[in-house]
Amino acid sequence: MDPSVTLWQFLLQLLREQGNGHIISWTSRDGGEFKLVDAEEVARLWGLRKNKTNMNYDKLSRALRYYYDKNIIRKVSGQKFVYKFVSYPEVAGCSTEDCPPQPEVSVTSAIAMAPATVHAGPGDTATGKPGTPKGAGMTGQGGLARSSRNEYMRSGLYSTFTIQSLQPQPQPPIPPRPASVLPNTTPAGVPAPASGSRSTSPNPLEACLEAEEAGLPLQVILTPPEAPNQKSEELSLDPSFGHPQPPEVKVEGPKEELEAARAGGFSSEAVKAEPEVSASEGLLARLPAILTENTAQVCGLSTSTTEITQPQKGRKPRDLELPLSPSLLGGQGPERTPGSGTSSGLQAPGPALTPSLLPTHTLTPVLLTPSSLPPSIHFWSTLSPIAPRSPAKLSFQFPSSGSAQVHIPSISVDGLSTPVVLSPGPQKP
């Protein structure tokens, strides 16, 4: 037998043969049911056909499950080794004695469940196989197998892909239908551009024509590149437009101010220096009041000996007085230091060297009010037990800067004989 025969064809051939009743037999020819009387023998014969010596019923049953999905063979539930042809195939060349009644089986199978027959062609029967004339001269066993194999391959039962591939083939006449519709639309659109291409109908030809017409003005505009520049220059020179004028007004404004400033004899640097001068003038304006308060405090403290005994911290305020000496002594330095040199100029604010007036001078750059400080500073200075390291420095710490301070350098070391001052005084190294 031909090895290309499928399993269901092999079983059907066994059922057609009269001498195979002991291994396979019909249980219901009308329903297409058959039973594997000797399932192992049927499997062995199927193995011989496929050249597989190790074939058994387990492998045969798994092969039959493949036809479950193809809707060719179905297992009858509740009965062992009983199967049923769902779509009973017609084998060409079989005689009426060997073949079961085909019309009855085909009708019952078509009524029961035969979705493959729905996809069959006009020449197909309920089996889904193309109809072939019986007795076409193919009496040979190999010829029957080949024809059945080829017919099965061409039928829709072999694979669903063949059905899907055969369906688009009869559809070529369908594309001419849109083609016939297109000529109807194109003639309607052809006269429209001829009469007036500006019509509102959204035809592709009109859109293309409009795009071409729209491209022509672009070429005309690009040919004279100097025209836009002239127009822009005219727009900039034209006084009717207000956009270019504001920059001119903004530019002319500062120029007029600079010219007016130059005409008046003031430069931009002088204008910038005015706030600084005003700030320095404000400081100088307040300095007399601060200095008068300082001198008044010095006069009040000159009677006590503690004012003279506090020059120990004199060296620390010198660093603080260096940046302040040029600004604080800008106009009053010569009055306070009439005959002193550079060293006396740095030590000119004598009251700042005492702890009583040190906080006031450190606060003057911050422009804080020193009016509330003198009472507390006065008590702190009278109660401070700090004594100078050497009394010889007293004459250099307080140069004569006013009539109120004339008595300060005249005080000698004997004036330090108060018990409050002499307790820590000369004993320090």
Swiss-Prot record:
<feature type="region of interest" description="Disordered">
    <location>
        <begin position="119"/>
        <end position="146"/>
    </location>
</feature>
<feature type="modified residue" description="Phosphothreonine; by MAPK1">
    <location>
        <position position="369"/>
    </location>
</feature>
<dbReference type="GO" id="GO:0036033">
    <property type="term" value="F:mediator complex binding"/>
</dbReference>
<keyword id="KW-0010">Activator</keyword>
<feature type="glycosylation site" description="O-linked (GlcNAc) threonine">
    <location>
        <position position="382"/>
    </location>
</feature>
<dbReference type="GO" id="GO:0071480">
    <property type="term" value="P:cellular response to gamma radiation"/>
</dbReference>
<protein>
    <recommendedName>
        <fullName>ETS domain-containing protein Elk-1</fullName>
    </recommendedName>
</protein>
<feature type="modified residue" description="Phosphothreonine; by MAPK1">
    <location>
        <position position="418"/>
    </location>
</feature>
<dbReference type="GO" id="GO:0031966">
    <property type="term" value="C:mitochondrial membrane"/>
</dbReference>
<dbReference type="GO" id="GO:0071774">
    <property type="term" value="P:response to fibroblast growth factor"/>
</dbReference>
<feature type="region of interest" description="Sufficient for interaction with MAD2L2">
    <location>
        <begin position="350"/>
        <end position="400"/>
    </location>
</feature>
<dbReference type="GO" id="GO:0000978">
    <property type="term" value="F:RNA polymerase II cis-regulatory region sequence-specific DNA binding"/>
</dbReference>
<feature type="modified residue" description="Phosphoserine; by MAPK1">
    <location>
        <position position="325"/>
    </location>
</feature>
<dbReference type="GO" id="GO:0140537">
    <property type="term" value="F:transcription regulator activator activity"/>
</dbReference>
<dbReference type="GO" id="GO:0009416">
    <property type="term" value="P:response to light stimulus"/>
</dbReference>
<dbReference type="GO" id="GO:0045471">
    <property type="term" value="P:response to ethanol"/>
</dbReference>
<dbReference type="GO" id="GO:0003682">
    <property type="term" value="F:chromatin binding"/>
</dbReference>
<keyword id="KW-0325">Glycoprotein</keyword>
<dbReference type="GO" id="GO:0030425">
    <property type="term" value="C:dendrite"/>
</dbReference>
<feature type="cross-link" description="Glycyl lysine isopeptide (Lys-Gly) (interchain with G-Cter in SUMO)">
    <location>
        <position position="255"/>
    </location>
</feature>
<feature type="compositionally biased region" description="Polar residues">
    <location>
        <begin position="302"/>
        <end position="312"/>
    </location>
</feature>
<feature type="DNA-binding region" description="ETS">
    <location>
        <begin position="5"/>
        <end position="86"/>
    </location>
</feature>
<dbReference type="GO" id="GO:0110088">
    <property type="term" value="P:hippocampal neuron apoptotic process"/>
</dbReference>
<dbReference type="GO" id="GO:0000981">
    <property type="term" value="F:DNA-binding transcription factor activity, RNA polymerase II-specific"/>
</dbReference>
<feature type="modified residue" description="Phosphoserine; by MAPK1">
    <location>
        <position position="423"/>
    </location>
</feature>
<dbReference type="GO" id="GO:0006355">
    <property type="term" value="P:regulation of DNA-templated transcription"/>
</dbReference>
<dbReference type="GO" id="GO:0010467">
    <property type="term" value="P:gene expression"/>
</dbReference>
<comment type="subunit">
    <text>Interacts in its sumoylated form with PIAS2/PIASX which enhances its transcriptional activator activity. Interacts with MAD2L2; the interaction is direct and promotes phosphorylation by the kinases MAPK8 and/or MAPK9. Interacts with POU1F1.</text>
</comment>
<dbReference type="InterPro" id="IPR036390">
    <property type="entry name" value="WH_DNA-bd_sf"/>
</dbReference>
<dbReference type="GO" id="GO:0043679">
    <property type="term" value="C:axon terminus"/>
</dbReference>
<dbReference type="GO" id="GO:0071394">
    <property type="term" value="P:cellular response to testosterone stimulus"/>
</dbReference>
<keyword id="KW-1017">Isopeptide bond</keyword>
<dbReference type="GO" id="GO:0140416">
    <property type="term" value="F:transcription regulator inhibitor activity"/>
</dbReference>
<keyword id="KW-0539">Nucleus</keyword>
<feature type="modified residue" description="Phosphoserine; by MAPK1 and MAPK8">
    <location>
        <position position="384"/>
    </location>
</feature>
<dbReference type="GO" id="GO:0045944">
    <property type="term" value="P:positive regulation of transcription by RNA polymerase II"/>
</dbReference>
<keyword id="KW-0832">Ubl conjugation</keyword>
<dbReference type="InterPro" id="IPR046328">
    <property type="entry name" value="ETS_fam"/>
</dbReference>
<keyword id="KW-0597">Phosphoprotein</keyword>
<feature type="modified residue" description="Phosphothreonine; by MAPK1">
    <location>
        <position position="354"/>
    </location>
</feature>
<feature type="modified residue" description="Phosphothreonine; by MAPK1">
    <location>
        <position position="364"/>
    </location>
</feature>
<feature type="region of interest" description="Disordered">
    <location>
        <begin position="227"/>
        <end position="253"/>
    </location>
</feature>
